[in-house]
C-alpha cells in the first residue's frame, strides 16, 4: 500500500477528530471541519457496528502516526509478544519511533515533516546520523539536529510553534543545543485519551 499524499484535512474529517497532521499554526477548526465527513455536503456519520468502531479506531491511530497497514500490523504483533497490556505496548512502540520523537521534541511541526527531516539525514541519535523514521529510540538516547539542518526554515518554524505546546515529561529538550533526551517510555496516562487501543486489540484478536 502506498503512503497517502492527499489532503490531510480529509483524513481528520474521516476520523472525526484532529489527527495532528497539520502544523498547528492556525486553529484546526479554521482549516478543517472535522465534524463533517468528506464527500457529500452535509452528510452525517452513520451508526457503526462493533467491527466498524474497531476498524475506525485502528485507521485513526495508523493515520495519526503515519504508518502503513503492514507496518501497523507488525507493530501489533511485536506489542503482543511483550509483557504487559498489548494496547499500551503498541502505543509505546509507536511513540518510540524516531520520527515521532523528533515531532514530540518540537523539531518538526508535524510527524510527516519530522519523517522528512529524518529521511533527509537531518537527525542524529547519540551523535550518529540515523535516516530511518521507524528506528526505535531507547531510554537514554539523545536525539539532536545536525548543524546544517538547524538553519532550515521549516526547523526554525517548528521550534517556534513548539513553544506553545504543553511540555512532555518523558522527553527532555535542550532548546539551546537543540537536542532531546528520551528519558523513558511514556505511561498510558501521558498519551491521548481520545485513543481507545482496546478496540484495536479486539480487532486484531479476531
UniProtKB/Swiss-Prot annotation:
Q: Do you know which PROSITE patterns this protein is assigned to? A: RIBOSOMAL_S4, S4
The UniProt GO MF terms for this protein read: rRNA binding; structural constituent of ribosome
What are the annotated GO cellular component locations?
small ribosomal subunit
In this record, what's one Pfam family?
Answer: S4
Top-level lineage group: Bacteria
| S4 RNA-binding domain mapped to chain residues | 96-158
Q: Which GO terms describe its biological process?
A: ribosomal small subunit biogenesis; translation
Q: Which keywords, in A-to-Z order, does the entry hold?
A: Ribonucleoprotein, Ribosomal protein, RNA-binding, rRNA-binding
**Membrane spanning residue stretches:** none
Which family, according to the similarity comment? Belongs to the universal ribosomal protein uS4 family.
Share what the entry says about its subunit structure, partners included.
Answer: Part of the 30S ribosomal subunit. Contacts protein S5. The interaction surface between S4 and S5 is involved in control of translational fidelity.
Q: What does this protein do?
A: One of the primary rRNA binding proteins, it binds directly to 16S rRNA where it nucleates assembly of the body of the 30S subunit.
Q: What is this protein called?
A: Small ribosomal subunit protein uS4
Q: Name the source organism.
A: Marinomonas sp. (strain MWYL1)
User: Gene name?
Assistant: rpsD
Amino acid at each position: 500500500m502506498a503512503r497517502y499524499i492527499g489532503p490531510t484535512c480529509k483524513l481528520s474529517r474521516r476520523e472525526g477528530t484532529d489527527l495532528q497532521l497539520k502544523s498547528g499554526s492556525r486553529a484546526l477548526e479554521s482549516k478543517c471541519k472535522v465534524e463533517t465527513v468528506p464527500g457529500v455536503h452535509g452528510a452525517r456519520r452513520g451508526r457503526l457496528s462493533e467491527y466498524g468502531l474497531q476498524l475506525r479506531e485502528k485507521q485513526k491511530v495508523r493515520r495519526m502516526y503515519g504508518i502503513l497497514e503492514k507496518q501497523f500490523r507488525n507493530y501489533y504483533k511485536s506489542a503482543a509478544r511483550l509483557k504487559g497490556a498489548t494496547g499500551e505496548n503498541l502505543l509505546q512502540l509507536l511513540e518510540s519511533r524516531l520520527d515521532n520523537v523528533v515531532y514530540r521534541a518540537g523539531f518538526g511541526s508535524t510527524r510527516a515533516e519530522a519523517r522528512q527531516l529524518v529521511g533527509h539525514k537531518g537527525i542524529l541519535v547519540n551523535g550518529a546520523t540515523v535516516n530511518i523514521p521507524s528506528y526505535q529510540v531507547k531510554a537514554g538516547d539523545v536525539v539532536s539536529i545536525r548543524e546544517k539542518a538547524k538553519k532550515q526554515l521549516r526547523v526554525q518554524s517548528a521550534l517556534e510553534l513548539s513553544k506553545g505546546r504543553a511540555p512532555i515529561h518523558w522527553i527532555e529538550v535542550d532548546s539551546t543545543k537543540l537536542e532531546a533526551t528520551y528519558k523513558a517510555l511514556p505511561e498510558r496516562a501521558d498519551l491521548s485519551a481520545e485513543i481507545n487501543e482496546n478496540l484495536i486489540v479486539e480487532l486484531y484478536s479476531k
